[in-house]
Amino acid sequence: MQPFSIPVQITLQGGRRRQGRTALPASGISNGDPLKVHPKLPSSAGEDRATLLGIAMMASSVLMFFLLGTTVLKPFMLSSPREESNCTTVHTHIADDWLDFAFTCEGSCQGQGTYPCLQVFVNLSHSGQKVLLHYDEEAIRTNPKCFYTPKCHGDRDHLLNSALDIKEFFDHNNGTFPCFYSPDGPLGVVLRKSGHKVVFHCLFWPLLTLLGGALIVGLVRLTQHLSFQCEKYRAVVRA
C-alpha cells in the first residue's frame, strides 16, 4: 500500500515544469537570438519619499495661490486706489455699547465675543471734511463704524485698556499725520494702506514652494537617470 505515491508524482511533475519555465530565461536564447534585457533600476524608499514631498509641496502651493488670491489679492485688486493726504485729529470716542463679533483666530480666541468700538474723527486736509478714520482696509470691510476690530476677544479689561491706549495716543497727537483717502468719496480714510508688499507676499511664498517642490522632483529624476546610465556603463565595461 502506497498512500503517498500520487502526491509525490504531482510534486515531481510540478517541479519539472518550474525548472522548464526558469530554464528559458536563464539560457538567454529565443529563436536563436540573444534576449535583449533592459534593466530597470528600482527607486529607493528615500527617493520615493522625496518625490512625494515634492508633489505635496507643489499641491500646497497651488492651494496657497487659490486661498491667498480669493481672500487677499481679490479684495486688494478690487479696492479703489488711494491717495495720500494729511489728517488732523478732531476728537475720539468710545461707544457705550460694545459690539458683537465672531472671532476666527486660533486657540482660545475663537467664538463669539464683544469689543469696544473706538471712533477716531479727523479733519482731512484735502477737502477740509470731518471723516471717520480707520486703521486699514480690512477694518473698513470688517466694521466701517469703528477704527479697528481686535483680532481676538481676550479679556474684557484688556480690550478696554487697548482701546483707551489708542484713544490717548490720538488725543495727545494734536499735529497732522499722513493718511490715505479714496478719490471716490470721503469715506474709507485709512491710516495704513496695503501696498505692493501684500502682492509680493501673496505671490512670493506660494511661488517659492512651487519651485522648491519642482526642484526636489527634478533632482530625484536626475539622480535616477544618472544611476541608470552608470549601470549601463558598468555593464558595457564588464562585457
Swiss-Prot record:
Gene Ontology MF terms in the entry: calcium-activated potassium channel activity; potassium channel regulator activity
GO biological process entries: action potential; detection of calcium ion; neuronal action potential; potassium ion transport
Glycan attachment points: N86, N123, N174
Cytoplasmic side: 1-51, 219-239
Residue ranges that the UniProt entry lists as topological domain Extracellular: 73-197
Subcellular localization: Membrane
Post-translational modification: N-glycosylated. The extracellular domain contains disulfide bond essential for the gating mechanism.
Disulfide bonds: none
InterPro entries, A to Z: K_chnl_Ca-activ_BK_bsu (IPR003930)
UniProt signal peptide: none
Region (Disordered): 15-38
Keyword Transmembrane: yes
Entry superkingdom: Eukaryota
Transmembrane segments: 52-72, 198-218
Keyword Transmembrane included in the entry's annotation: yes
Record's bilayer topology term: Multi-pass membrane protein
GO cellular component: plasma membrane; voltage-gated potassium channel complex
UniProt xrefs under Pfam families: CaKB
Keywords in alphabetical order: Disulfide bond, Glycoprotein, Ion channel, Ion transport, Membrane, Transmembrane, Transmembrane helix, Transport
Domain comment as written in the entry: The extracellular domain forms gates to block ion permeation, providing a mechanism by which current can be rapidly diminished upon cellular repolarization.
Stated family: Belongs to the KCNMB (TC 8.A.14.1) family. KCNMB3 subfamily.
Physiological role: Regulatory subunit of the calcium activated potassium KCNMA1 (maxiK) channel. Modulates the calcium sensitivity and gating kinetics of KCNMA1, thereby contributing to KCNMA1 channel diversity. Alters the functional properties of the current expressed by the KCNMA1 channel. May partially inactivate the current of KCNBMA. Two or more subunits of KCNMB3 are required to block the KCNMA1 tetramer.
Oligomer status and interactors: Interacts with KCNMA1 tetramer. There are probably 4 molecules of KCMNB3 per KCNMA1 tetramer.
Protein name in UniProt: Calcium-activated potassium channel subunit beta-3
